[in-house]
Amino acid sequence: AAAALARDEPEPVAPPAVPAGLGRKHRGKESTQQAFGRFFVDLVHDAPEVAERVVTVSPDVASSTNLGGWINKSAIFSVGERRDWFADDPQTLVHWHETGRGRHIELGIAETNLVGLLGELGATWSRYGQPLLPIGTIYDPFVGRALEPWSFGIYAGGQSILVGTPSGVSLAPEGGAHQSIVTPSIGIGLPGCTAWEPAFGQDLEWTLLHALSRLGQPGGESAYFRLSTRPVEQVLAGEDASDERRRSVLAGGYPIRRAEGRPRVALAGMGAVMPEVIEAADVLGDGVDVLCITSADLLFRALRARAGFGEHQADILDELLPADRAAPLVTVLDGDPHALAFLAAVNATPLTPLGVTRFGQSGDLAEVYEHHEIDAETIVGAALDASDAQSG
């Protein structure tokens, strides 16, 4: 029986070298979901050998997760050639050309089938010696629905990227049904996977390229991205596109602003709420450190490593939250507040964790943020209370 199951080991093909950056200047207002869509256009142009290995998969949300440009260039996979009856319609933005060489697979409403397919596509490097770079997109609340089969695929050696977008209550203008709260915590707790929640387009570009570079190889790793449709002014991140900034982004976070001398309070934000965090810092004035978290997952690993658990590097903690700048900490995200609460343990500082603990509300974004107490005014109040308590 064993002989019948035996097979020759395939000659492995190394995955293509993934560039560190794509050279796009991220300016004006841009959401991370928009940056995600533009990423594929840039990848085809600047790194075609990488793009040739990319396979995207979506249930019924290819267009609404900004894969339209990629689909127009890569086509839909189909066993046989199919005619696109709307190809001559000038109002059709996405051309559903179906061919055996297509690199996007459309599944309909079937999230569990999607992640099962991601696992299989992500295992071709070990089974057939041919690495693929699979990326799946789903609305973020359905990450929970897809979690068990995707985690099983990761456990079995399938390396893939899952993008949950849009996410949080930031999509409140669309309604209350698709809001996600617990997914940041899911990302932190999933073995074999790194969770990312970038706030800015440049950070998304760097982290997604890095995630692609970790696929299709021994010792590789899957990735989960939590993105948003909320447009954010890119200038808020500063103009720093240096290698040092990139290393910090890939390590889990970086300072956007440092107070002169020791700060009175530190504000740490992640994802779509960074404009509110920075606005609050502007109101508070001098004496505030502002930190942009790109991966709570990596920072939590670093905290454990500093205590002697795991093999992760802990250097980012000294860069992001140095002991000589320890101050009361206010954390903010569009998700459950406990996902960033561990940061207070870095320097044993007082903590005020702000985030979303209820869902189902639809309305204007400013009103919804105020309702969930992740607006700038609430952040200012929390920072003042924390600072006063420390000085008192």
What name fits each language-model region?
Residues 1-392, ...:
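Thiamine diphosphate
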